[in-house]
């Protein structure tokens, strides 16, 4: 179990990065496999434990930085959820957790997954849309690990992974973009057509197709035959076009001044102000509409605080359990979390000033 003060310090990093305009958020993942072991789907329990022990030992030996090895079978569910939420980790964790682990550094900048789809996934989250800086951190850690670990590598196919399309650099780059105006105008699907061979669009949550909070998640489909720089450059290009289209869509909404948009925004404020239970879909969708209203200067915060960050994370159940429950009695039961979520959003909604 991760010490509570360490987890709190990691989770609150986002609170110091408040900006009036939400920026795209980026996550990067490098996949690696040990050259001496079979891929994860072919490993026995004993083999998975051996892989975990081998990799964890090397993290512990890294000088100048402290890492915490967290076997999933021993990690409380709420704490596991909180870590996955903070890092926007893209992998769904099943019920069979033997030989699987998460590893975090004390600075809260990096997360590693052991024996998930591959033996090792080195993962990081970038809150300020500087993916090149994050990539260098991942590469630096990868180089340090390669001093003592031999990763499966082919001169023809690069780093070998369980998914053939993920070989090569084995880099997955994801961008999370807030696009409420494009979603409202049903313009997003057409906008993404030219890029659908390069990038996949998905939901905020793994294994879910539902759109939450008007958030678009884009990730590269293939890393084979592409350099890290090419992947990031392509991602930046697509995101810039999406942001430009979103700005145009918002300007159009302001010009048209539609009653329906204002009505949705005001209803969202009312929902967050007066609800006694809120599920994640309701809360994120309402927050998205309010953030749209703030960008149009129809709503402002009396304390001049932006709403979207950190609420983008803080409405999720792991964070709600961390911030709003006693240490000895944390629960992520649906009914309990729905009540806590409504209680947590109420004071933030009450200090909003309506300019419509």
Swiss-Prot record:
The record's listing under Pfam families reads:
ATP-gua_Ptrans
Q: Is this entry keyworded ATP-binding?
A: yes
Where in this chain does the record put each Phosphagen kinase C-terminal domain?
22-249
What EC class is this? Answer: transferase
Keyword RNA-binding appears in the UniProt entry: no
UniProt binding sites for ATP:
25-29, 172-176, 202-207
Q: What Enzyme Commission number(s) appear in the record?
A: 2.7.14.1
* PROSITE patterns per record: PHOSPHAGEN_KINASE_C
One of the record's GO molecular function terms = phosphotransferase activity, nitrogenous group as acceptor
- Reaction(s) this enzyme catalyzes, per UniProt: L-arginyl-[protein] + ATP = N(omega)-phospho-L-arginyl-[protein] + ADP + H(+)
Query: What are the entry keywords?
Result: ATP-binding, Kinase, Nucleotide-binding, Transferase
Family the entry assigns: Belongs to the ATP:guanido phosphotransferase family.
Please give the function described in this protein's UniProt entry. Answer: Catalyzes the specific phosphorylation of arginine residues in proteins.
Looking up NCBIfam families in the UniProt record yields: PRK01059.1-1
Q: What is this protein called?
A: Protein-arginine kinase
């Amino acid at each position: 179990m991760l010490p509570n003060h360490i987890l709190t310090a990691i989770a609150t990093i986002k609170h110091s990065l408040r900006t009036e305009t939400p920026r795209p958020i980026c996550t990067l993942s490098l996949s690696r496999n040990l050259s001496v072991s079979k891929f994860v789907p072919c490993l026995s329990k004993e083999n998975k434990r051996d892989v975990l022990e081998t990799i964890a030992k090397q993290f512990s030996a890294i000088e100048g930085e402290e890492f915490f090895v967290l076997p999933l079978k021993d990690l409380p569910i709420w704490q596991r959820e909180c870590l996955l939420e903070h890092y926007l980790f893209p992998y769904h964790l099943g019920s069979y957790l033997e030989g699987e682990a998460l590893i975090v550094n004390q600075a809260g900048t990096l997360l590693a997954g052991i024996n998930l789809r591959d033996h090792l996934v080195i993962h990081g989250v970038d809150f300020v849309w500087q993916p090149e800086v994050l990539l260098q951190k991942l590469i630096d850690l990868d180089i340090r690990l390669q001093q003592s670990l031999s990763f499966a590598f082919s001169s023809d196919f690069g780093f070998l992974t369980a998914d053939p399309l993920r070989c090569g650099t084995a880099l997955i780059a994801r961008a999370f973009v807030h696009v409420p105006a494009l979603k409202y105008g049903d313009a997003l699907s057409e906008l993404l057509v030219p890029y659908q061979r390069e990038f996949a669009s998905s939901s905020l949550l793994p294994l879910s197709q539902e759109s939450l909070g008007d958030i678009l998640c884009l990730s590269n489909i293939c890393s084979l035959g592409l350099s890290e720089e090419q992947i990031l450059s392509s991602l930046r290009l697509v995101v810039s076009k999406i942001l430009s289209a979103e700005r145009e869509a918002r300007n159009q909404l302001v010009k048209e001044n539609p009653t329906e948009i204002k009505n949705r925004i005001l209803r969202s404020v009312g929902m967050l102000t007066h609800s006694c239970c809120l599920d994640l879909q309701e809360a994120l969708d309402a927050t998205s509409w309010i953030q749209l209203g703030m960008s149009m200067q129809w709503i402002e915060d009396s304390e001049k605080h932006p709403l979207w960050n950190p609420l983008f994370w803080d409405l999720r159940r792991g964070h709600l359990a961390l911030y709003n429950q006693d240490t000895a009695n944390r629960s992520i039961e649906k009914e309990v979390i729905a009540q806590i979520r409504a209680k947590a959003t109420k004071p933030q909604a009450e200090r909003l000033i309506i300019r419509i």
